[in-house]
């Protein structure tokens, strides 16, 4: 039985704004995750309990929740996704750039 997807509205907007080829790859990756949520890499330390799935230069970060639900936490470029995810789960504000 397939899992259900839960995502914050801002993640849906982010996916909608991606380049069509990347959007197609993200949707394909989400289908794979929903079919087998353990397919992503288990994260450690501060991100324990989350998983990451690669989509080219991007990463999908998610958690497996109760009731056969996969919760999307973040989607973004590999370079910044883990610090952004940490900020989101600890609700720390983004510092302004120089």
Language-model features: locations:
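Enriched for short, Lys/Arg-rich terminal
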Residues: 2-4, 16-17, 63-98
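Context-gated lysine
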Residues: 23-25, 41-44, 91-92
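Basic/aromatic recognition patch in beta-strand/loop cores that engages polyanionic ligands
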Residues: 38-82
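Arg/Lys-rich, positively charged N-terminal/basic patches that mediate binding to nucleic acids
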Residues: 1-25, 29, 98
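Short proline/glycine- and basic residue-enriched helix-capping loop/turn segments at helix->loop/beta transitions
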Residues: 32-37
């Amino acid at each position: 039985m397939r899992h259900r997807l839960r995502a914050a509205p801002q993640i849906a907007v982010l996916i909608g704004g991606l380049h069509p080829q990347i959007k197609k790859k993200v949707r394909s990756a989400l289908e794979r995750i929903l079919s087998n949520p353990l397919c992503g890499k288990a994260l450690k330390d501060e991100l324990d309990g989350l998983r990451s799935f690669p989509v080219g230069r991007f990463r999908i970060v998610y958690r497996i929740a109760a009731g056969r639900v996969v919760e999307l936490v973040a989607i973004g470029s590999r370079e910044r996704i883990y610090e952004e995810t940490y900020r989101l789960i600890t609700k720390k504000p983004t510092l302004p750039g120089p």
